[in-house]
Amino acid sequence: MFTLAHLSDLHLALTPKPSELASKRGLGYINWQRKRKHIHRPDVLAAITRDLQARSAQHIAVTGDLTNFSLPGEYAWARRWLESIGQPTDVTVIPGNHDVYVRGAEKLPAKFWSDYIRGDDGLERFPFVRRRAEVALIALSTGVPTGPFMATGRLGERQLARLAEALEQTRGSFRTVLIHHPPLSPARRFFRRLIDGADLRRVLVEKGAELLLHGHDHRRSLVWLEGNGTRKIPAVGVPSASAYAKYAKEDPAGYNIFRIEGSSGNWRCETVSYQRGGDGAISECARYRLY
């Protein structure tokens, strides 16, 4: 059995310098001061981290938005947090839209997290593939700079083509796709959607996958996507790992543990969700079989 932990959307935030407020960060900082700083709290993340570590998962996937304004100081803070939860070989990271908040931030993930965003082939490009026991982790990046009031993501043709190749090359493994933006968003979330989500879904229909993990929505969710053949693909979302229950608009902080075993055509996968309640206690809140 292989145990995989999934958490997302830490939103580690520092105060931008005055010179940095002329960009999109200025509007983001106003929003942070008005409400988001009350939601995303380091003490909540610390509690979630301690609880997660006690579960002794074999691998941890972090699906983006580790930072809030994509400041170098936030990246360094996130790096220290990553080092606290595991070795780079045991932790896989992808960026989210907040990690590429403004132009110029695209280079920061490789600068600060290079050994956490590198595949088994040693190359720093997306998607990258990490094989761990019977699981093949296929990591994508949807983080692109966007204008004010936008939180969209994009994969692009090159990344989609490489994804198709990776899914084909890892056929027979428990292929787990890591992505920040969900592959399917309701119309009301137009400004937060994955722009080429339909293209991603077409690749998944053509090549198949066993599991897709995402963040972005700050909600615990499960959506079944069309896959290759008769079996559908579970797309599982997770809440923000730092969301304080009292002020969270969506679900309070939590994470998931996946227990995976079996072989191609005979997989078994159980998901257990943990959540930090209003009283500060972290407990199991859901358990279900995907396979």
Report residues per predicted region.
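A short C-terminal boundary segment appended to hydrolase-like catalytic domains
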Residues: 260-291
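Active-site environment of divalent metal-dependent phosphoester hydrolases
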Residues: 11-14, 68-71, 97-105, 145-149, ...
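Active-site neighborhood of phospho(di)ester-bond hydrolases with catalytic His/Asp-centered motifs
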Residues: 6-8, 59-65, 91-97, 141, ...
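Beta-strand-turn-beta hairpins that frame and shape the catalytic cleft
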Residues: 1-5, 16, 129-139, 168-174, ...
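N-terminal active-site segment of His-dependent metallophosphoesterases
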Residues: 1-75, 83
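Short acidic, glycine-rich surface-loop motifs adjacent to enzyme active sites
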Residues: 170-186
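Conserved beta-sheet core of the metallophosphoesterase superfamily
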Residues: 189-264
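Extended active-site neighborhood of metal-dependent phosphoesterases/phosphodiesterases
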Residues: 72, 76-162, 202, 229-231, ...
